[in-house]
Amino acid sequence: IGHYYWDLLVRDSDRVEAFRELFGDERADYQQALDNYYANGAPEDWQDRCISAYAASHPWEDWAESFAHYLHIVDTLETSEHFGITTERRLPDGAVQGAAPDFDSYGVADFGPIIDQWAPLTFALNSINRSMGQTDTYPFVLSPKSIEKLGFVHQVIRDNRL
């Protein structure tokens, strides 16, 4: 789905240069990039700059993976809001981090508050799953660069809403 929205919202827009600065130049040969990924795997530093190993294969895949994760994040936050789920945990420095039950991820202009809600919620969900002997519901670590890319996706979507 991310590929479709890249064509619709980024390809011919004034954001394509910002996209290239953040994700890389999508004009690089796509098939060659995928062949290289399947032959050699992801670069060693993929975790510093991409949301998944596959995202490191080509800028289009980086966008598509980021877009998919963005949908996971806002959909999960919306579901938790619908059910009134709230979380709160004390951090090592004594600060309290929590997710509010009435948070509207679609209504915020900046992506920062979304991550602020997402982090404690996924920590709680992953902890519950582990308590039940299951794998994490969201086993991904979001690097600062990945969060920046998710923020870009958020802005593109907000700027193009109807």
Predicted regions and their residues:
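Post-HEXXH active-site segment of zinc metalloproteases
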Residues: 7-38
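Active-site-adjacent bridging/hinge elements
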Residues: 32-45, 96-97
